[in-house]
């Protein structure tokens, strides 16, 4: 709100704000509107975190994935702020079931440092597949868990330089992100590896179909004879 004017206060912010909502425009602080002019709370929260941090302070916040690729001017301005004016370190894409049974939306973690002077050269992307729990409403423990791997790779980002875009994590140059309207969705940059599939000749497939039809006809005839007795 306009009454809450705290700024440049915190060294670290870890947040999971409400995913979606709106505020009346007259109730929004001008300092937030200066970052991105919007009434959407998922964007305003990120702007608020930027304002609350001291220079050098860091933030890891969860956002709905629409924040990463939304095409509105407000979405683009917020992403541009993170990439151009702050130091955006990483984007961790999470599967849609991680917040079930409460919410089924796809989300991501934005990791950034407040600099007010830029600093982003490359952004680290990670495609999380599993978090140690099933992705249904029960959220039961399972063996698959990417979190230890995320921590390991994040703390050794120098090793990410040689990773291919087909892998689970990789780095993307700032300029490439800027050229794509500051899109921060991993699917924008990830390369899909297609494995060629070889099929048998058409004549061979037709021969198999004919053989199956003959077998079906034979067994159907036998079944009818059994029923007729």
Language model segments and positions:
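A conserved structural/catalytic subdomain of Rossmann-like adenosyl-cofactor enzymes
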Residues: 3-229
């Amino acid at each position: 709100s306009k009454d809450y004017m705290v700024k440049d206060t915190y060294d670290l912010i870890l947040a999971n704000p409400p995913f979606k909502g709106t505020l009346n425009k007259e109730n929004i602080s001008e300092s937030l509107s200066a970052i991105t002019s919007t009434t959407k709370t998922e964007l305003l929260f990120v702007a608020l975190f930027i304002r609350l941090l001291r220079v050098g302070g860091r933030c890891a916040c969860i956002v709905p994935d629409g924040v990463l690729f939304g095409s509105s001017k407000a979405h683009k301005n917020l992403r541009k702020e993170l990439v151009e004016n702050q130091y955006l370190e990483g984007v961790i894409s999470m599967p849609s079931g991680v917040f079930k049974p409460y919410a089924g939306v796809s989300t991501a973690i934005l990791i950034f440092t407040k600099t007010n002077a830029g600093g982003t050269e490359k952004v680290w992307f990670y495609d999380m597949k599993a978090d140690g729990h099933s992705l249904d409403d029960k959220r039961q423990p399972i063996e698959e868990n990417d979190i230890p791997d995320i921590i390991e790779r994040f703390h050794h980002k120098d090793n990410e330089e040689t990773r291919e875009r087909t892998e689970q994590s990789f780095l993307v140059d700032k300029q490439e992100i800027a050229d794509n309207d500051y899109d921060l969705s991993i699917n924008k940059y990830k390369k899909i590896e297609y494995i060629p599939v070889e099929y048998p000749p058409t004549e061979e497939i037709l021969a198999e179909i004919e053989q199956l039809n003959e077998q079906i006809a034979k067994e159907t005839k036998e079944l009818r004879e059994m029923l007729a007795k």
